[in-house]
Design a protein with these regions (language model features):
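Helix-coil boundary and N-terminal low-complexity module in membrane systems
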Residues: 1-95, 102-197
């Protein structure tokens, strides 16, 4: 399984190269990791590309929208930083809070997209509810991701990028599935409900 995780990791990184496909790539990465690696269904690459095609439009929309949103917040944060006044300091903290909330929503949004079929706006709302309701999980996942990125940039060799995203995704499924199951309907009789195993 470790070999498949590395292969999926490489495919994931290649899929992110167009940039606007990052959201779709993350969604498909989680889907294949959960279904094929953890639940031994089908082939990882087959499931990855199946999810990629299915979520391409929504995933791309999220990526572009998030890029614009974060760029706007960063721009406003820098304007507030230049002001050097109490109001500017308050606004910096406010914009930082918005970034944290955005990150918390995104942590759940891509797994939600991989599992549920609904409007994108409904997915965002559901992800926000999950982030608040399961705040300890949200904190662990966000802190873990930030810590991994920091450690990789500061201490680990560059080639580790071919390992750590897959390792984080695999580990993250154990917490994420506990959350997703709370919102999933009971499986129909005869259904291959791999996500309930």
């Amino acid at each position: 399984k470790a070999g498949w995780v590395i292969i999926l990791n490489i495919v994931f990184l290649i899929s992110c190269l167009p940039v606007f496909t990052i959201g779709t790539a993350v969604t498909s990465f989680y889907y294949a990791m959960m279904k094929s690696i953890r639940r031994d269904r089908s082939y990882p690459l087959l499931e990855y590309w199946s999810s990629f095609k299915r979520t391409f439009v929504k995933g791309s929309m999220v990526t572009v929208g998030t890029g614009i949103w974060i760029s706007l917040i960063w721009y406003l944060w820098n304007i507030a930083a230049v002001s050097g006044e109490e109001t500017g300091l308050f606004l910096q903290k406010f914009y930082t809070g918005l970034l944290v909330v955005t990150g918390a929503i995104l942590i759940y949004l891509f797994p939600v997209m991989s599992r549920f079929t609904m409007k994108l706006s409904s997915m965002v709302k559901l992800s926000f509810v999950m982030a608040v309701r399961f705040l300890p999980y949200t904190a662990i996942l966000l802190a873990g991701l930030l810590l991994l990125v920091f450690v990789w940039f500061r201490y680990l060799p560059i080639p580790m990028i071919f390992i750590w995203p897959g390792a984080f995704c695999f580990a993250g499924t154990f917490l994420m599935e506990k959350v997703l199951r709370k919102y999933m309907p009971a499986p129909a009789p005869g259904e291959d409900a791999w996500y309930y195993e």
